[in-house]
């Protein structure tokens, strides 16, 4: 498949964007609003004609592409990003082996799509609904992802909802990554190629 590396890079940047936003919300209580919008919209794009359609445009993955290129390193922040990525991808692997959970996830996302006829995706109630999907469907599969940040920030319900909604987006992107042929070996042996592809994409944004 000629576009395999492109598709894998786009999907992996989607996961990176979700975890970078989790890190921002957990520390500060706010995050890049455009990137947040892209990540949440990705959850409801369940029947795309191509990989990029899940996110809209390459420019809407700028945060994720930047994270892919320079955010996964040995600094405390980079180690945290790596931990979130590994945890999300391990959860997705467990999810993919659970037909019941996959079916439930599909049903719940369809319900969100129907609610979009009446509500904005970024209303507090809708973010809460997305968070509850993560809590009800993904969390029980385990193990739980330990999110670290500012305690006073993480104690606020609205921030907890944002974090869980973003983790759900990360799972959705991990599903996409697998659908376009992404495998664990690509993270070990093919990361350099993804970084090169991400640098090309960033240069033209």
From Swiss-Prot:
InterPro entries xrefs: HflD, HflD-like_sf
Chain ranges passing through the membrane: none
Keyword Cytoplasm carried by entry: yes
Signal sequence extent: none
Keywords: Cell inner membrane, Cell membrane, Cytoplasm, Membrane
SUPFAM superfamilies found in the cross-reference section: YcfC-like (SSF101322)
Predominant location: cytoplasm
Keyword Membrane (UniProt): yes
Membrane-protein topology: Peripheral membrane protein
Organism superkingdom: Bacteria
Location relative to the cell: Cytoplasm; Cell inner membrane
One GO location term (cellular component): cytoplasm
Family: Belongs to the HflD family.
Protein name: High frequency lysogenization protein HflD homolog
Organism: Vibrio cholerae serotype O1 (strain ATCC 39315 / El Tor Inaba N16961)
Primary gene name: hflD
């Amino acid at each position: 498949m000629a576009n395999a590396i492109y598709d894998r890079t786009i999907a992996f940047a989607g996961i990176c964007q979700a975890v970078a936003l989790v890190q921002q919300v957990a520390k500060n209580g706010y995050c890049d609003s455009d990137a947040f919008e892209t990540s949440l919209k990705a959850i409801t794009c369940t029947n795309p004609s191509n990989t990029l359609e899940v996110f809209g445009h390459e420019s809407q993955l700028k945060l994720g592409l930047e994270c892919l290129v320079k955010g996964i390193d040995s600094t405390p922040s980079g180690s945290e990003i790596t931990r979130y990525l590994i945890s999300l991808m391990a959860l997705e692997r467990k999810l993919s082996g659970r037909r019941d959970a996959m079916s439930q996830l599909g049903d719940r996302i369809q319900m969100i799509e129907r609610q979009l006829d009446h509500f904005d995706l970024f209303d507090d109630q809708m973010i809460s609904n997305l968070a509850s999907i993560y809590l009800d469907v993904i969390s029980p599969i385990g193990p739980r992802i330990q999110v670290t940040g500012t305690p006073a920030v993480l104690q606020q319900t609205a921030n907890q909802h944002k974090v869980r909604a973003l983790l759900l987006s990360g799972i959705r992107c991990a599903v996409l990554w697998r659908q376009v042929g992404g495998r664990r070996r690509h993270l070990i042996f093919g990361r350099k190629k993804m970084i090169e592809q991400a640098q090309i994409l960033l240069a033209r944004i």
